[in-house]
Swiss-Prot record:
The gene is mraZ. GO terms for biological process: negative regulation of DNA-templated transcription initiation. Residues 5-52, 81-124 form the SpoVT-AbrB domain. This is Transcriptional regulator MraZ. One of its GO terms (molecular function) is DNA-binding transcription factor activity. It comes from the Bacteria. PANTHER family: TRANSCRIPTIONAL REGULATOR MRAZ. It comes from Haemophilus influenzae (strain ATCC 51907 / DSM 11121 / KW20 / Rd). Forms oligomers.
Length: 151
């Protein structure tokens, strides 16, 4: 399970180091194999351990090729999906198109979302968090979507 937001750096070759606290789990369950793709709603990347990605692939496979919206989702998610293998130093290589989509430069944020990571430009991340907090403070959290949620 991946939790928390960690500042990491992208090196000159496009590699990012997975924080040490997550490496053993990724190696044990997935032999260091991960899949990275784009987020369809925001300018970040989604990084899945291989076993979690395989669940997503099955869901995408079940979508209709004849429904334009479902087909677009398949095209974007699968079309950008790139296998990433952790090297001996715990780094993964992010392809150029993925880095471009998320506007990645040197400073990144690796954000745990339990079954996956989001990878953000540090600038985009801080902007997004500020917006989320602002919207959250002006939103009625008693909305139906959160009725059964408690902290």
């Amino acid at each position: 399970m991946f939790r928390g937001a960690t500042a990491v750096n992208l090196d000159s070759k496009g590699r990012v180091a997975i924080p040490t606290r997550y490496r053993a789990e990724i190696l044990e369950k997935n032999q260091g194999q991960m899949v990275c793709t784009v987020d369809i709603r925001q300018s970040c990347l989604l990084l899945y351990p291989l076993d979690e990605w395989e669940k997503i692939e099955q869901k995408l496979l079940a979508l209709s090729n004849f429904d334009p919206t479902q087909r677009r989702l398949q095209r974007v998610m699968l079309g950008h999906a790139t296998e990433c293998e952790m090297d001996a130093q715990g780094r993964i290589l992010l392809s150029g198109p993925l880095r471009q989509h998320a506007k990645l430069e040197k400073g990144l944020m690796l954000v745990g979302q339990l079954n996956k990571f989001e990878i953000w430009s540090d600038v985009e991340w801080h902007t997004q968090i500020a917006e989320d907090i602002e919207i959250g403070s002006s939103t009625d959290f008693a909305a139906d979507a959160l009725n059964d949620f408690s902290l």
